[in-house]
Amino acid sequence: MHLSDLKHLHVSELVEMAISNEIDGANRLRKQDLIFALLKNQAKKGESIFGEGTLEVLPDGFGFLRSPDTSYLAGPDDIYVSPSQIRRFNLHTGDSIEGEIRTPKDGERYFALVKVDKVNGEAPENSKHKILFENLTPLFPTEQFKLEREIRAEENITGRIIDLISPIGKGQRALLVAPPKSGKTVMLQHIAHAITANHPEAVLIVLLIDERPEEVTEMQRSVRGEVVSSTFDEPATRHVQVAEMVIEKAKRLVEHKKDVVILLDSITRLARAYNTVVPASGKVLTGGVDANALQRPKRFFGAARNVEEGGSLTIVATALIDTGSRMDDVIYEEFKGTGNSEIHLDRRMAEKRIFPALNINRSGTRREELLVPQDQLQRIWVLRKLLYPMDDLEAMEFLQDKIKATKSNQAFFDSMRR
């Protein structure tokens, strides 16, 4: 019997199962207690129970398997992992573990892991010899994530324009700079849809920090990938814990040579949360930012890299500007030079309902010659020279008309020849 299968069932289905297994007072129990009772019942019959989760190692040496469905929140149905298992299999925070579990004995509160079957989808022996993420060699991105698709929908235009103006590669550290109400969340959704459609082998994680609950639900329903969230009514410590879990999980996957993409909305709110959490150093920068507060969000953002030994970690993070808060401007200024790709959104275009509201002259990718073939690069440069003297609004409208008139970017380049 699988713990995660029970978690996905509705309460009414669990109650029916409990009644058929003759558990007393089933309809008065909470969902967690129902799962507990059912699993205990199975264990009494001598059946094995299996569980899975993402490991969080606590300072005391032991750890727990947290569930991605609850965004790694500590709960009563977490699975305890003993220090000896962690040492034996060389486990770290962020490892995804599957294995056999047992019900709590007297005086225990949690399920316990008995046998480790898989670590990050592979046999546990394999993870002993992997190179740690910190020791891998970072390189410039050399392989592009194509965001253009074979559909004639509105959202394909977003992907095609990003492919032209600031292409995203495997291992890109991209900053999406956006004033409020400029369509950044929708743009992230479009990027997520394009990546899941064109690159199914990539592991996609959408991390929503300090977002509105209805946007979280919309993301979960529209994106085929893992959506991890911490809404704006949660404390700052929770934002920080979620972000740490996600980045550790991503690092473990990169060590197994996987391509991981994290879409973060937004790094500004994450930096604010860290600013609340860090102990006061006594030095305060403009806008009330503590001098040490930005080191950890920079470590999060700086983890994005293309790895020579195989695998890559791509992070597309949104940074808020023009919110009227000095702190947000300071945070943006600190992150400005750290990314190797920038996408600037424009408030004026969004107010005129031109989407994607991309500012062409200010957006771009460093070393894009490594991502884009040489013949296309010449054309893109010609296009930029043509669009430079125009007003930002006119340039975007002109580019959109030309893109809507052609079926694909290749056709668009061919039409430029004429």
UniProtKB/Swiss-Prot annotation:
Protein name: Transcription termination factor Rho
Reported function: Facilitates transcription termination by a mechanism that involves Rho binding to the nascent RNA, activation of Rho's RNA-dependent ATPase activity, and release of the mRNA from the DNA template.
Chain's gene name: rho
UniProt domain Rho RNA-BD: residue ranges: 48-123
SMART domains reported in the protein's UniProt record: AAA, CSP, Rho_N
Keyword Transmembrane helix: no
CDD domains the record matches: Rho_CSD (cd04459), rho_factor_C (cd01128)
Annotated positions binding ATP: G169, K170, G171, Q172, R173, A174, K181, S182, G183, K184, T185, V186, R212
Top enzyme category: hydrolase
Organism: Chromobacterium violaceum (strain ATCC 12472 / DSM 30191 / JCM 1249 / CCUG 213 / NBRC 12614 / NCIMB 9131 / NCTC 9757 / MK)
GO molecular function terms attached to this record: ATP binding; ATP hydrolysis activity; ATP-dependent activity, acting on RNA; helicase activity; RNA binding
Disulfide bonds: none
UniProt cross-references to Pfam families, sorted A to Z: ATP-synt_ab (PF00006), Rho_N (PF07498), Rho_RNA_bind (PF07497)
GO BP: DNA-templated transcription termination
Organism domain of life: Bacteria
PANTHER family cross-referenced by the UniProt entry: TRANSCRIPTION TERMINATION FACTOR RHO
Family in the record: Belongs to the Rho family.
Coiled-coil stretches noted in the UniProt entry, renumbered to this chain: none
Protein transport among keywords: no
GO cellular component: cytosol
HAMAP family, per database record: Rho
Enzyme Commission identifier(s): 3.6.4.-
Keyword terms, alphabetized: ATP-binding, Helicase, Hydrolase, Nucleotide-binding, RNA-binding, Transcription, Transcription regulation, Transcription termination
NCBIfam families, per the entry: PRK09376.1 (NF006886), rho (TIGR00767)
Assembly notes: Homohexamer. The homohexamer assembles into an open ring structure.
